């Protein structure tokens, strides 16, 4: 009986916290773009409440290669229904390993309105991508470093520690 009462109180606290939320996580994935030989994190948030005019969303993505987190910042506008956050290119993503993402929604004064923490795990290793882009430029010209004049190809993956 005491356990049931504790669970009800805990559930009530969770609803209260959610009532103040400005946005919720609606999607997260690694994007592997073979054409440009890049991988990025892609996170989407769905707006729950009006966004603060002049506010900012800041996301920090764990660097799969190690080192400090990769951070992006984006202005918020009241008309936004969803917020899309994409990391700078990342390297050495490993299949099944959860990588951390921390998101902060800030009001115009820089005060934190909400934080969201999550992880993203890829279902493939980054070695599915070649180390060099397959095409160059807006016309998708073949990259001569990959498609050589002698007819051979170079699809080797990027060198990453194991």
Where are these regions (language model features)?
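Bacterial N-terminal signal peptides that target proteins for export
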Residues: 1-3
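C-terminal motif of bacterial Sec signal peptides marking the signal peptidase cleavage site
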Residues: 9-12
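Bacterial lipoprotein signal-peptidase II cleavage site
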Residues: 14-20
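Contiguous beta-strand segments within globular domains
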Residues: 25-47, 52
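Solvent-exposed serine/threonine-rich low-complexity stretches and specific carbohydrate-binding patches
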Residues: 64-83, 118-122
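Short, solvent-exposed, Trp/other aromatic-anchored flexible loops in extracytoplasmic proteins
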Residues: 79-113
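Short beta-strand elements
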Residues: 111-162
């Amino acid at each position: 009986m005491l356990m049931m009462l504790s669970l009800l109180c805990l559930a009530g606290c969770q609803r209260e916290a959610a009532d103040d939320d400005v946005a919720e996580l609606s999607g997260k994935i690694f994007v592997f773009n073979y054409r440009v030989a890049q991988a990025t994190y892609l996170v989407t948030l769905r707006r729950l409440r009006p966004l603060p005019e002049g506010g900012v969303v800041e996301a920090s993505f764990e660097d799969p290669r190690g080192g400090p987190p990769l951070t992006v910042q984006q202005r918020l506008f009241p008309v936004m229904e969803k917020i899309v956050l994409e990391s700078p290119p990342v390297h050495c993503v490993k299949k099944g390993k959860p990588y951390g993402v921390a998101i902060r929604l800030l009001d115009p004064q820089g005060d934190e309105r909400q934080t969201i923490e999550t992880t993203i795990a890829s279902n493939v290793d980054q070695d599915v991508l070649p180390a060099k882009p397959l095409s160059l430029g807006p016309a998708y010209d073949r990259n001569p470093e990959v498609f050589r004049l002698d007819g051979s190809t170079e699809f080797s993956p990027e060198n990453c520690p194991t």
